[in-house]
């Protein structure tokens, strides 16, 4: 409702007359709204508060005000993101924030050559299987690090292939790529972009890419932003799954990563860059035309 928006969002930053003119409503109507029974406004506010708390819980306590505000109509209410932000503060809830520290999983001190950067930080794609982004991260456990290799389709942000291992051997990256190929059956010409790590520069990886007609692309040395979309994916995984959680065994971590990728990230988690839908929903909508 426009009157509620004026009261909650505009009245403290401009005059009522100016706010009413901007939203094409009358000041007299606004003042009548303010005199309406307090109970009705309170009921609406409580409904919004309940919806905000519910959506935050359903998102695994991950979503911030913008995504929660976008999801409110699903529960039959609406509110500006600033109102949602205030409600979150009042209830002591907030989105998880990412940590900036990241250990090195790139082993670039090898004798293999490096391929040129074919993307130049341009991750935009006009369809599926144009640009695949690849990288390796780690998940700490009481049994030692578990390494996770992933392949993302830049078009939909879908994780099309992934693999886990207790070592940084090239096998973990190759298995993720094989999963991606099996799932997508891509045409020849896909750009496979990664860092310069030995897992991607080795002969085994180059042969696999050649077998499937893929063009190899690598970030420049020391430029993590050349693969920023994958770096962002790993930061999201760490924020939502790893930080503040202790995995006692490799198996426990494997199961948690599987659930995060295949159930949460792919099918449920909404992405602002995809129009606030999940990767799976984005691809389904594209197929439906």
Describe the predicted segments one by one.
Residues 1-289:
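Charged DNA-binding/catalytic regions of mobile-element recombinases
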């Amino acid at each position: 409702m426009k009157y509620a928006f004026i009261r909650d969002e505009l009245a403290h930053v401009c005059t009522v007359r100016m706010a009413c003119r901007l939203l094409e409503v009358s000041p007299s109507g606004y003042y009548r709204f303010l005199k309406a029974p307090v109970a009705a406004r309170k009921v609406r506010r409580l409904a919004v508060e309940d919806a905000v708390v519910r959506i935050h819980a359903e998102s695994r306590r991950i979503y911030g005000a913008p995504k929660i505000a976008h999801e409110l109509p699903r529960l039959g209410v609406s509110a500006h993101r600033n109102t949602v932000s205030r409600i979150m503060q009042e209830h002591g809830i907030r989105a998880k924030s990412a940590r900036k520290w990241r250990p090195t999983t790139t082993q670039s001190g090898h004798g293999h050559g490096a391929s040129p950067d074919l993307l130049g930080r341009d991750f935009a794609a006009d369809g599926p299987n144009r640009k695949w982004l690849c990288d390796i991260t780690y998940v700490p456990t009481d049994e030692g690090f578990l390494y996770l290799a992933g392949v993302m389709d830049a078009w939909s942000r879908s994780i099309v292939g992934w693999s886990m291992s207790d070592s940084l051997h090239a096998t973990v990256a190759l298995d993720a790529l094989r999963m991606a190929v099996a799932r997508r059956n891509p045409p020849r010409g896909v750009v496979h972009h990664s860092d310069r790590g030995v897992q991607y520069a080795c002969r085994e990886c180059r042969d696999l890419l050649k077998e499937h007609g893929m063009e190899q692309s690598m970030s420049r040395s020391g430029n993590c932003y050349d693969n920023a979309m994958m770096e962002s994916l790993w930061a999201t995984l760490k924020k939502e799954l790893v930080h503040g959680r202790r995995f006692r065994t490799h198996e426990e971590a494997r199961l948690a990563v599987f659930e995060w990728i295949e159930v949460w990230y792919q099918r449920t988690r909404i992405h602002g860059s995809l129009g606030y839908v999940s990767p799976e929903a984005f691809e389904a909508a594209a197929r439906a035309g």
